[in-house]
Amino acid sequence: MLPSKYEDNALQIKEKSTERTAPFFVLEVTARSAADILGIHPNSAALFYRKIRTVINHHLVLAADEVFEGPVEPDESDFGGRRKGRRGRGAAGKVVVFGILKRNGRVYTVVVDNAKSETLLPVIKKKIMPDSIVYTDSLSSCDKLDVSGFIHYRINHSKEFADRQNHINGIENFWNQAKRVLRKYNGIDRKSFPLFLKECEFRFNFGTPSRQLKILQDWCGI
């Protein structure tokens, strides 16, 4: 076993390396490219990126009990692979993600087994304040949910997409941003996917790269 002073030194090296890689992370530079610029092994950069994602996941899980009120947009989307047509409903090989966006606020996401009512409704009741205004896509599984405890508006894209209030543009914007971020990884294994999903949630919720970096420095203690 290494003496404690060597263990402390190793920890300091890891913290310094994480500090060096964090700016590349918030700028969406891949771990391989960050490793090339920093002159470190790609596996080391990937390890530091994973540490950052683990820290992000930890803090977002701690904040998961926050209840959304006011206008909210729940929706589900499939991630992984390619398929023709609109978002699937748990197509084979895909990961189903349920999201709730608070208007002018944050988004919350969770991986679910399927988009059935018995799966999604408990999440809605836990995360959304009763009597809140809920906007759902008329073509999504969420539209079939029993949301009798809320003020429910069903959005028909062909008729109301341009309406100033009656829309689900917020959650749709998140899905588009998340899929753009994840696309560059060229495939993510199902076990690691929740960490990458929370990375997307973090990027969406915490604005500019400079703000994200300050938050990561605080969370990582660097």
Tell what function each PLM region has.
Residues 1-222:
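Residue-level recognition of single "structural anchor" positions
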